[in-house]
Amino acid sequence: MTARAVVAVASLAAGLATAGCVNFYEVTVETPIQAKLDVTPFQRVLVAGFLGGGTKNLDAAAETSRLLRSQLRTKSGMRVIDADALQLVQEVDKRRTTPLPPGDTAQDEPRIKNEADLKEYEQILTDTEFWKKVGQEYQGPLIITGSVLFAEVTRSGVISKPRQYTDQMGRVQVEERREFANQKGYSLTPKFVFIDGRTGVQLYSESFHEEALYSESQNTPALSSYFELMDKLLPGFLNTLSTQKIKGTRVLIK
């Protein structure tokens, strides 16, 4: 279609709408997104625990284990095994031939503070024999494990903020204003690892990253920010195990 034809069609649609000959209405549509992993061989799932770290304000590993169990009970067809989460950080520390330096053993500080620290522990996620033993204890379920970093972040820069004002005609208008601001918040970086409990072999893994930033003067609890960020990530996690439906709207002309 030529540019002139497009303009003509648009003008006709606008004219018909003005004349009251056309009705526009929205309809809700659902788009299925196929599961990333075939879980048909498994009837049960074990959320085994996570390597957690970042800030001392929140136990990211424990919160993630609890949240995923709750989500899987209501949104998956598998039975969730009720078991305590494995303490994976302590498991790796027990295997060390060289003890940790005294400065690294403070009780209120997490062993894993950043990505560099995490690399010292990640080998347990690919330890086939370890996960095979875990699987044998629970009769070969699908095992979910991984790592989760929940860290404090600060950002400085130019941001856009909406400003509401009243124009000369008395109408309320909104405009975007750009201004420099200091912000603080949290970042969430989980890696979900799916393991065949019958063999200990890793079947699939996927990483995510989200940030939530707030005004420097705003005091947002760590737990509130954690749940805000996990809400964004959960659809991607659940889509690994089952087909998810994404809801949207379409505008139809009648």
What role is predicted for each listed range?
Residues 2-7, 127, 138, 225:
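Residues at the start of alpha-helices and the adjacent loop-to-helix junctions
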Residues 1-21:
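Sec-dependent bacterial lipoprotein signal peptides
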Residues 21-43, 137-138, 150-254:
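C-terminal/domain-edge helix-coil "capping" segments
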Residues 44, 48-152, 197, 201, ...:
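N-terminal segment of the mature soluble domain
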Residues 2, 28, 49, 53, ...:
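Generic alpha-helix detector with strongest preference for long hydrophobic helices that associate
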Residues 10-13, 39, 72, 180:
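A generic structural signal for short, solvent-exposed coil/turn residues
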